[in-house]
Structure formats: structure tokens, C-alpha cells
């Protein structure tokens, strides 16, 4: 509806999938009986976050290097494919939040296994993030999903605030 003599306001009806655009996967997306998007703890989605650049196949050794400083929230810029072993390393390290630029975290043959490793560990998983203009560094992240019970994912609009911003 639009503003007119009979309607005092604009009102839009949205129809979209839970995995359209930049979105967060809930554990329920790949793990039967797991938490839905409304049950993802918000502290996983808000706080200090490392942005790192990586291209290619991300191995367990690469994952361990990225988390060597104790990072709990990680956004990865670049065209990556996370290996199953890297997903397991992220899970074992206790990572809270992982975001990537691609539409999915795994490869064509490993996507299900990568998702299951990450989501079984209840890592908040962000896909299709727009990070091309974000330099590597540490930021404050705010990336809360919609608070809608039963969903296996949710559109998100991540915000990064530069701790070192001048002015």
C-alpha cells in the first residue's frame, strides 16, 4: 500500500527465503532437532571481530593460524572454500561466529559436511557477506538475525565499526 487519500502510510509486504542475500544459518539448517535462529545467542553475533583475507582452500592449519590470537568472531574476505578439517578446527577452537563472502562455506562435494561441522558446534554462520571494501583488521561487529522462532536462517545486515577510526 502507498500513501494516498485513503491510506496514511506506506506499507510493504515482503516475501523472501531465509537464506536470501546476506544471511545467517541456524544450527537447524543442517542439524535435525538443533536450535532455530531465534535461539542463537546474540553475544555470538555482537562484539570484537577479526576480518582476514584468504583465497583458495582453507585447511585446518590455516584455520588454526587465523585463530591463534584467541579470536571468537571471524569474517573472511576472498574466494574461499572451507575444508571439512578447517571446519572441525574452528569447532574445536570454540569459534563463536564465522562469516564468508561466498554463498556457502563449503565446496560442491563438501558443503553438507562443512555446514554440519560448524553448525553442530553452534557457530553462528554468516554467508554472502559484502566485505570487499573492508580492510583486514579488528572491528566491533553487530550482526543480529531476525528474532523469529522456527526459522533455519535469517537475513542479516552486519555492521562493522573500526576501533581505530579517526574523526
List each language-model region with its residue ranges.
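Active-/binding-site microenvironments in catalytic and ligand-binding cores
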Residues: 1-167
Amino acid at each position: 500500500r502507498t500513501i494516498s487519500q485513503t491510506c496514511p502510510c506506506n506499507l510493504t509486504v515482503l516475501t523472501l527465503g531465509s537464506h536470501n542475500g546476506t544471511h545467517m544459518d541456524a544450527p537447524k539448517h543442517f542439524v535435525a532437532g538443533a536450535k532455530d535462529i531465534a535461539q542463537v545467542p546474540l553475544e555470538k553475533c555482537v562484539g570484537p571481530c577479526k576480518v582476514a583475507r584468504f583465497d583458495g582452500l582453507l585447511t585446518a592449519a590455516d584455520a588454526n593460524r587465523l585463530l591463534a590470537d584467541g579470536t571468537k568472531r571471524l569474517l573472511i574476505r576472498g574466494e574461499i572454500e572451507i575444508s571439512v578439517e578447517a571446519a572441525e578446527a574452528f569447532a574445536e577452537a570454540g569459534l563463536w561466529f564465522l562469516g564468508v563472502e561466498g554463498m556457502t562455506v563449503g565446496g560442491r562435494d563438501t558443503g553438507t559436511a562443512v555446514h554440519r561441522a560448524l553448525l553442530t558446534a553452534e557457530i553462528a554462520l554468516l554467508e554472502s557477506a559484502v566485505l570487499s571494501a573492508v580492510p583486514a583488521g579488528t572491528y566491533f561487529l553487530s550482526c543480529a538475525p531476525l528474532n523469529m522462532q522456527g526459522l533455519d536462517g535469517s537475513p542479516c545486515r552486519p555492521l562493522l565499526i573500526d576501533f581505530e577510526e579517526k574523526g
